Amino acid sequence: NPTSQILLRRILRGDNGITTRSLALDSVQEAFNLTPDILQLRFQTHAPALASQAARNALIKADLVSQDLDAVIISTCTGYLCPGLTSYLSESLGLDPSMILLDLVGHGCGAAIPNLRNAHALIHSGQASKVLSICVEVCSAAFYLDDDPGVLISACLFGDAAAAAVCSSRPSAAHRPIQTIAMQSTMRPEHRDL
């Protein structure tokens, strides 16, 4: 549809406030291969790699190694693996097989909140003292395109990336601590389609 193509060009080339966006693709043309098998393979290939890199970066910044962790929590909404992403991360980081591993799937844009709430709960219950919290999205594995302007704008906004943080009951003296005082989230089912 020519109107859709014009909208896509305006969003991607215009002054939209987005300075960079990363996609875990070798070429932009790959983004238009939207068969279910390709999308699943894209997620299975890139989500573990992005999560592992974010985890390694967080561990380096915290002056820790993976054996120092008691738990790992991963959130995503752009794909599904069974067993989950934590099984891939466990393998790539050489995690203790008895470690607490939690996969949170389907929380959408606010996934960091339940992820951090679970980390907070594990720490304050005494079940863990160091929890690696990871959010990873491979939006190129969840692409859906049609002529709806909302769908087109969404496809142009989101990229493929991961972020991670180490949550601890004992903050490091070398790093500025962030203290969790309280967390709250609200679910509004009537706004699910926004």
Residues covered by each model-derived region:
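Buried hydrophobic positions in well-ordered alpha/beta secondary-structure cores of metabolic enzymes
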Residues: 12, 69-72, 115, 135, ...
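Short glycine-rich or small-residue beta-strand-to-loop segments that form or flank ligand, phosphate
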Residues: 42, 70-76, 103
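Active-site glycine-rich loop that binds ribose-phosphate moieties when present
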Residues: 104, 114-116, 135-160
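Short coil/turn connectors at secondary-structure junctions
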Residues: 66-70, 97-100, 125-131, 152-153, ...
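Phosphate/pyrophosphate-binding loops at sites that engage ATP/ADP/AMP, CoA/4′-phosphopantetheine
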Residues: 54-69
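Phosphate/oxyanion-binding active-site loops and adjacent basic polyanion-contact surfaces
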Residues: 43-52, 112
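Condensing-enzyme catalytic core mediating Claisen C-C bond formation in acyl metabolism
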Residues: 1-44, 145-194
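Conserved catalytic cysteine-centered active-site region
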Residues: 23, 33, 76-130, 141
